[in-house]
């Protein structure tokens, strides 16, 4: 959903950037047997949860699955603008 909103109202990406991102998602799928849709959904949900606690720059966000031997690691690089004083819905 967030991806759709970004496409309609958001940033312009070059066709090379879009092709590179699609290729990266295909390679991740091949190596980890995870669909590109799964990875995109994971990224959107991470944005939703992390945004409760801090303001982030979604444009610079990078979420990947890396494989080494028989292990898979989720690696997220998320630029943080600032921390929020209290989490939304916090009981404090």
From Swiss-Prot:
Transmembrane segments: none annotated. InterPro entries: MinE (IPR005527), MinE_sf (IPR036707). Keywords: Cell cycle, Cell division. It comes from the Bacteria. The keyword Cell division applies. GO terms for biological process: cell division; regulation of division septum assembly. HAMAP family: MinE. Belongs to the MinE family. Prevents the cell division inhibition by proteins MinC and MinD at internal division sites while permitting inhibition at polar sites. This ensures cell division at the proper site by restricting the formation of a division septum at the midpoint of the long axis of the cell. NCBIfam families: minE, PRK00296.1. This is Cell division topological specificity factor. The lineage of its organism: Bacteria, Bacillati, Bacillota, Clostridia, Eubacteriales.
């Amino acid at each position: 959903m967030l991806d759709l909103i970004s496409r309609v109202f958001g940033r312009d990406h070059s066709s090379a950037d879009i092709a590179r991102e699609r290729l990266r998602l295909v390679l991740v799928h091949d190596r980890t047997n995870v669909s590109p849709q799964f990875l995109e959904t994971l990224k959107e949900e991470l944005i939703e949860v992390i945004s409760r606690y801090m303001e982030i720059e979604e444009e610079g966000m990078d979420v990947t699955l890396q494989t080494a031997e028989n292990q898979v690691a989720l690696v997220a690089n998320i630029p943080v603008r600032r921390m929020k004083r209290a989490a939304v819905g916090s009981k404090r």
